[in-house]
């Protein structure tokens, strides 16, 4: 039973006249929300977790190695000694190391891990706003796995390039090993791993907990044979990964390091997916080196929606993939990630987002594998699911490093293969050595030495030739700062502010691309009492007007109390979970953080699948709420948005009214910007007009080091008119609008003119009648009276 179906039961307490169903349809996909990390749970490892669990610490980037941050109870310095092969020969993919652990010599036998990594994937990055293909220097054959000689149940998984970095399991104790960067003697740190954190997932599966495992459906013998055949063969998930700008900076703004780190993460995720006989293959990587082309707010629900739109528009036609995952670097508050259930192999919803705001690769890879499981149709486990001796099932609400797929996960995955025929997972990717892909002129992507790429529209393109070179005299071919094949003037406005919390960007006169989108730092005050988040002022009045149109506004407190204390799908502070089968009732302090309740509604919105509206009488008006829980439009438009004001110095975050410190606002504009500007999302000053960046202390035209140079007021006025006729398409649209206006206005003008002429004619006839000369008899009479008087 779906979440919406379960909600209908809870809504039955409302009287039917009060519930006016606008639309209600079943959908097939569901977004998943992840909760925050909990740092107080211990981890005790057992031998059976060898492959799937602890491999994930293998590739901790050495630049982020911080022994004080590792959950360890003790550590020692060791010097691994690589042993030569028998007879001095290279064993070919095999290597042995000797090291001293706790006073005892341990011999490690390792073998290169087969099949992974795939080395023929394209790597894209941006240079002056132009998408280009990179060829980073990558280490190959770095990932080795093996065992300790003479230690039953032992397991070793390490990266041997640039020292040993990874995990060793001995007698149910897990050890981490990392090289010491300052050592000249190949010294390493070996430490025991304890008290590892877990990720908690609080989202309800699409089916009720009692039905999650699903009784076996009656299948035809042929179906069973097909499923058995599918299960016995390795499945391949072709994954495209995107790294956002902040995470790229956390990897030292180094493309080589970022690529290697992503390859390592994918390799480690494979140690989980082996449990369902599936291999993740990296088919492409894009690094947002110059800023994020989409809005990436704290709320990952919005990020998932924005990323999926970007994926459909920019990626689908460029690189074939079964799923695409976005890795972001910021702390997302209560959420750790988002994924579409059953999204793999679908062109519309093959997306997920994960937050990697720490350096615990182990936990992050577990989260990635969990979300990938949802992409593959695997729902959350319930208490009756089993996953062997592991402490946590990977698809349970508690996701730990000691995790694995359960029997329920296998059943869900089998049904996904059956329902979707598993076509996209059964294609084995080609095994080729990694090489730079030759530029493919005409694919719409600027590659290698291409100056432009007009795709299939080269014949009519004014700037780019079919040979992917700029035409004679052209400086550029596309971009917000390119007009008529030339760069726009320095200081021209290229992206105006969309909200009071957004900031404008300007062209620098030397490139065709507009600078990355910038906005006021999350937590900046707006509209008197509200706060900015992701470039938008989280004002509930504005949210109501966006849904219902003007003059809708946020309802009074009585409406919020009446609606959000019902604990049904029209009013709640949280959806059901497998631990709690009911909707959450909003407490008094959280009542403004549940469903958005609006009043003064004059127009009903165009509803979407699975949307319903509720109206509750309030005085002479109505209070309106919306149940918009579905997968094609996340986040739920009916919920109060994260970051919305709920009490003095407090904001809503995951249905809870909490301190505004969760927005991580750390700007002091009076000090940093000398009171002449605000802080942007890059934590730089955006100066008011009349002051210059970087600190707004000297005269200038305003802006920031991120926004591009701001033109003088006269230039900005010209750039606005420049924007108004930026392209021939815009001109055509304007001409069409003008033509339509003329068609409407001219007849009206003619009618009015005709009426005026008729009125003038009528008035003129009346005037003529009044002033017309007297008749002859009247003249004679008048004349006789005159004679009489004279006598």
Curated annotation (Swiss-Prot):
Its main location: membrane. It comes from Mus musculus (Mouse). Glycans are attached at residues 72, 256, 407, 484, 630. This is Disintegrin and metalloproteinase domain-containing protein 1a. The gene is Adam1a. It is a single-pass type I membrane protein. GO terms for cellular component: membrane; membrane raft. Zn(2+) binds at residues 370, 374, 380. Testis. It is found in: Membrane. SUPFAM superfamilies: Blood coagulation inhibitor (disintegrin) (SSF57552), Metalloproteases ('zincins'), catalytic domain (SSF55486).
């Amino acid at each position: 039973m779906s979440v919406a179906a379960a909600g209908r039961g809870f809504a039955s307490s409302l009287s039917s006249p009060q519930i006016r169903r606008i639309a209600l349809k079943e959908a097939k996909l569901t977004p998943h929300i992840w909760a925050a990390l909990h740092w107080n749970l211990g981890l005790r490892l057992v031998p059976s977790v060898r492959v799937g669990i602890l491999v994930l610490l293998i590739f901790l980037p050495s630049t982020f190695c911080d022994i004080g941050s590792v959950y360890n109870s003790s550590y020692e310095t060791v010097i691994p000694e690589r042993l030569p092969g028998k007879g001095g020969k290279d064993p070919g993919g095999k290597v042995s190391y000797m090291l001293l652990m706790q006073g005892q010599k341990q011999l490690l036998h390792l073998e290169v891990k087969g099949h992974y990594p795939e080395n023929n994937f394209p790597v894209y990055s941006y240079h002056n706003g132009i998408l280009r293909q990179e060829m980073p220097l990558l280490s190959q054959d770095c990932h080795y796995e093996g065992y300790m000689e003479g230690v039953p149940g032992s397991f070793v998984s390490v990266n041997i390039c640039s020292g040993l970095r990874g995990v060793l399991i001995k007698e149910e104790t897990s050890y981490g090993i990392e090289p010491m960067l300052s050592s000249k003697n190949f010294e390493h740190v070996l430490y025991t791993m304890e008290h590892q954190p877990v990720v908690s997932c609080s989202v309800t599966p699409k089916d009720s907990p009692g039905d999650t495992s699903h009784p076996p459906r009656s299948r035809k013998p042929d179906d069973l044979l097909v499923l058995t055949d599918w299960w016995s063969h390795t499945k391949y998930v072709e994954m495209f990964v995107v790294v956002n700008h902040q995470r790229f900076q956390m990897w030292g703004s180094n493309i080589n390091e970022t690529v290697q780190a992503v390859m390592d993460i994918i390799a480690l995720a494979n140690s989980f997916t082996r449990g369902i006989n599936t291999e993740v293959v990296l088919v492409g990587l894009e690094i947002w080196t110059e800023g994020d082309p989409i809005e990436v707010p704290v709320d990952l629900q919005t990020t998932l929606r924005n990323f999926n739109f970007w994926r459909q528009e920019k990626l689908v036609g460029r690189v074939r993939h079964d799923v695409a995952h976005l890795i972001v670097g910021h702390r997302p508050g209560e959420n750790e990630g988002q994924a579409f259930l059953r999204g793999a192999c679908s062109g519309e919803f093959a997306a997920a987002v994960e937050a990697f705001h720490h350096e615990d690769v182990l936990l992050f890879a577990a989260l990635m594998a969990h979300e990938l499981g949802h992409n593959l149709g695997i729902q959350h486990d319930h208490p009756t699911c089993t996953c062997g001796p592991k402490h946590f099932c990977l698809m349970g609400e508690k996701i730990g490093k000691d995790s694995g797929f359960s029997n329920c996960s296998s059943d869900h995955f089998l049904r996904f293969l059956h329902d979707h025929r598993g076509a996209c997972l059964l294609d084995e990717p080609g095994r080729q050595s990694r090489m730079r892909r030759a530029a493919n002129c005409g694919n719409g992507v600027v590659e290698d030495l291409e100056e432009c790429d007009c795709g299939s529209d080269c014949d009519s393109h004014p700037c780019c030739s079919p040979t992917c070179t700029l035409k004679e005299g052209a400086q550029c071919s596309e971009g917000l700062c390119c007009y008529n094949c030339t760069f726009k003037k320095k200081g021209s406005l290229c992206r105006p502010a969309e909200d009071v919390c957004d900031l404008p960007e300007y062209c620098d006169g030397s490139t065709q691309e507009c600078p990355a989108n910038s906005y006021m730092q999350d937590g900046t005050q707006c509209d008197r009492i509200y706060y900015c988040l992701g470039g938008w002022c989280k004002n509930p009045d504005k949210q109501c007007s966006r849904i219902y149109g003007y003059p809708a506004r946020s309802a009074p407190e009585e409406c919020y109390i009446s609606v959000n204390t019902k604990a049904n799908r029209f009013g709640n502070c949280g959806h059901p979970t497998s631990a709690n089968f009911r909707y959450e009732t909003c407490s008094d302090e959280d009542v403004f953080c549940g469903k958005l309740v609006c009043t003064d509604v004059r127009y009903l919105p165009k509803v979407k699948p699975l949307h319903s509206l509720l109206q509750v009488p309030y005085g002479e008006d109505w209070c309106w709420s919306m149940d918009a829980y579905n997968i094609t439009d996340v986040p739920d438009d009916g919920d109060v948005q994260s970051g919305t004001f709920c009490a003095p110095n407090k904001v809503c975050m995951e249905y809870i009214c909490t301190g505004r410190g969760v927005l991580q606002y750390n700007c002091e504009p009076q000090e940093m910007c000398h009171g002449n500007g605000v802080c942007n999302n890059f934590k730089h000053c955006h100066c008011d007009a009349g002051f210059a960046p970087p600190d707004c202390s000297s005269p200038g035209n305003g802006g920031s080091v991120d926004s591009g140079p701001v033109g003088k007021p006269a230039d900005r006025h010209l750039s606005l008119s420049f924007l108004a006729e930026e392209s021939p398409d815009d001109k055509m649209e304007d001409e069409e609008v003008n033509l339509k206006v003329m068609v409407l206005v001219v007849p009206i003008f003619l009618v009015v003119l005709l009426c005026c002429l008729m009125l003038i004619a009528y008035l003129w006839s009346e005037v003529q009648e009044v002033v017309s000369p007297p008749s002859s008899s009247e003249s004679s009479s008048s004349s006789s009276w005159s004679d009489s008087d004279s006598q």
